[in-house]
Each structure stands twice: as structure tokens, then as C-alpha cells.
């Protein structure tokens, strides 16, 4: 009879290597138990809160004829409201992406007195009711306001006098610049809070290594920093745009609500509801939903391409 060995049949090192191997995606193995229950609850919650209300909006429009639908969503007044809503939202999101990046950079990289106060002020648009924000902005930027009393004449002589920017208007409050101002105010935190964690993980040694290799500041920004920040910057841009597109409370006070000039689509939807035109309001809501989803989908695809291109 052969002697019984005290050593195990398998090498412990081989067993450890097997345990340490990552589980490939789609293998059916889950680290946490209850995946089926969690997935079912997620689908139920998403359907109850998001899909069912949106489906109801689409079903409401199915009761309209094509002539009624086109008359409701393609009138001259509605098309002007589309241009104001989408145009002002894109401009506000672009401004937030630019200045939000600078603000996040300063808050992360430069210690200065009062930095915590400034960091807390970034979240103020989250906590402040939008109606209060609209009233405050109107009081500040109106013709007789603290800021508007000296800024509006300067605006008329500079920006308002340029031929290519005459569509903005010759004043701030009660015109299109006021709409952009309100949307910029409520969307800034989305960009700053999205970029801050990425900037905190970005090591300053990358900039030092770039400078050591002879790169200029502009080359360091465009070839080192921006590729790292691009996905987060696009995410912040998309969130800011989506938030601005559905904004109502702050814009209604500072825009003046002039049809074909400063009227936004959410205000037009409220107007139709007050007139008991539920089908017309639902049709506008569906167009806004499809349009905003298409823009956000394009931004997400661009963000995905940016991440893949950066990895390559």
C-alpha cells in the first residue's frame, strides 16, 4: 500500500491564481446575491416612474389626427419657442462647460481663503427655488437693478451693436440674454460637481512631466488635460443642457414671455393647459421629449467615442 501524502493534490499557488482571475462579463456569475430580484425591482421602478408616464404622453397624441398634430407643434409661435428653448439651453450649457471647468479647476488646485464658502455657493442653485432665483436675477439685471443699471448700457454699446449678435437683443432682462442668464445659473453646479472628482484624481505630475518634455502650456492643456477631462466635461454639458431645457420657474420671471421672442416651450405648455388644450400640450411635450432625447443620445455617443479614442 503506497504511503498517504500529507500534501494536497493541487498546488495552492495555482488555486490562488484561479481565484484571483477576474470573472468575465456575461459569464452568469455575480459577486452580490439576488441579481434577479434587484433587476426586477429596477425594471419595475423605472417603468413605474419613467416609462409609464412617458408612454401615456405618447398614447395621448395617438388620438390626434396628423393635421391636428402638425398644427399644434409646427405653428409659427411654437417654432419660435423651440428656437428659444433649444438655442438658449445649448448656449447656457456651453457657457457652463467653459466657466464650470475654470471654477472646478480653481476649487481643486488652488487653496485660498474662503474656498469652502465658494464651494458651498456652487450648490446654491440646487437648494434655491427656481422662482426665487428668477425674481433675484430680474431684480439685479433689470434696467433699474443694481447690475443692470450700468451693465445694460454697456451691453447695448458692445454686444448688442454687433451685427452677428443682434438676435440676442439690446437688453439683458426681459430679452433673450435674460433667458440664457437664468439657464446658466441653474445649470452651473452640474458641470462643476461632475468635473471636481476627475480633477482631484488627476495627478499634477502629469503636467510637470509634460513641461519637462518640452511641451508648452497650450500643448499640455490640449494634449494632456483635456483628453482626461473630456468625458466628464461632456457629461456635465449634457446634464446642464437637460436641466436647462425643462426649466420654467426662473425663466418665466426674467424673460418677459414675449411670443416669438422670449417665450419658451415649457411656458407654452402651461399656457395650453390653462386653456384646457390637453392634446396640444401633450403634443408639445412629446416633441420636446424626442428632441431632447436625440440631443442627449448624440452627446452620450460622443462621450463614448471620446473615451474609446482616449484609451487607444
Predicted regions and their residues:
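A mid-sequence, solvent-exposed acidic-amphipathic segment
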Residues: 218-222
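The alpha-helix within a helix-turn-helix
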Residues: 210
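Glycine-rich helix-loop "coupling/hinge" segments at transmembrane-helix boundaries
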Residues: 250-276
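Transmembrane alpha-helical segments of polytopic membrane transport and secretion proteins
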Residues: 1-42, 298-312
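Membrane-water interface segments at the C-terminal ends of transmembrane alpha-helices
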Residues: 31-65, 72-200, 224-249, 253, ...
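Glycine/proline-centered hinge or cleavage motifs at structural transition points of membrane proteins
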Residues: 213-214, 227
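Short glycine/proline-centered loop/turn elements that form peptide/ligand docking sites
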Residues: 202-206
Amino acid at each position: 500500500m503506497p504511503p498517504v501524502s500529507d500534501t494536497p493534490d493541487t498546488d495552492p499557488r495555482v488555486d490562488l491564481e484561479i481565484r484571483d482571475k477576474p470573472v468575465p462579463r456575461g459569464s452568469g456569475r455575480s459577486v452580490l446575491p439576488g441579481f434577479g430580484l434587484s433587476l426586477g425591482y429596477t425594471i419595475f421602478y423605472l417603468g413605474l416612474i419613467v416609462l409609464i408616464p412617458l408612454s401615456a404622453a405618447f398614447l395621448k397624441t395617438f388620438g390626434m389626427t396628423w393635421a391636428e398634430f402638425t398644427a399644434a407643434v409646427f405653428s409659427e409661435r411654437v417654432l419660435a419657442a423651440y428656437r428659444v428653448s433649444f438655442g438658449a439651453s445649448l448656449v447656457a450649457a456651453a457657457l457652463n462647460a467653459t466657466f464650470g471647468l475654470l471654477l472646478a479647476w480653481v476649487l481643486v488646485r488652488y487653496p485660498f481663503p474662503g474656498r469652502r464658502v465658494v464651494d458651498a455657493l456652487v450648490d446654491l442653485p440646487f437648494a434655491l427655488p427656481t422662482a426665487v432665483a428668477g425674481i433675484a436675477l430680474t431684480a439685479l439685471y433689470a434696467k433699474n437693478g443694481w447690475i443692470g443699471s450700468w451693465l445694460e448700457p454697456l451691453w447695448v454699446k458692445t454686444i448688442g451693436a454687433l451685427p452677428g449678435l443682434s438676435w440676442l437683443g439690446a437688453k439683458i432682462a426681459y430679452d433673450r440674454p435674460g433667458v440664457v442668464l437664468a439657464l446658466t445659473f441653474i445649470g452651473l453646479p452640474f458641470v462643476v460637481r461632475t468635473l471636481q472628482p476627475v480633477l482631484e484624481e488627476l495627478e499634477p505630475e502629469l503636467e510637470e512631466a509634460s513641461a519637462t518634455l518640452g511641451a508648452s502650456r497650450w500643448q499640455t492643456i490640449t494634449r494632456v488635460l483635456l483628453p482626461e477631462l473630456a468625458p466628464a466635461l461632456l457629461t456635465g454639458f449634457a446634464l446642464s443642457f437637460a436641466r436647462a431645457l425643462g426649466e420654467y420657474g426662473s425663466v418665466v420671471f426674467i424673460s418677459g414671455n414675449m411670443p416669438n421672442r422670449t417665450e419658451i416651450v415649457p411656458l407654452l405648455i402651461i399656457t395650453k393647459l390653462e386653456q384646457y388644450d390637453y392634446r396640444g400640450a401633450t403634443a408639445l411635450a412629446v416633441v420636446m421629449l424626442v428632441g431632447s432625447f436625440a440631443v442627449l443620445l448624440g452627446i452620450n455617443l460622443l462621450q463614448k467615442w471620446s473615451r474609446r479614442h482616449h484609451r487607444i
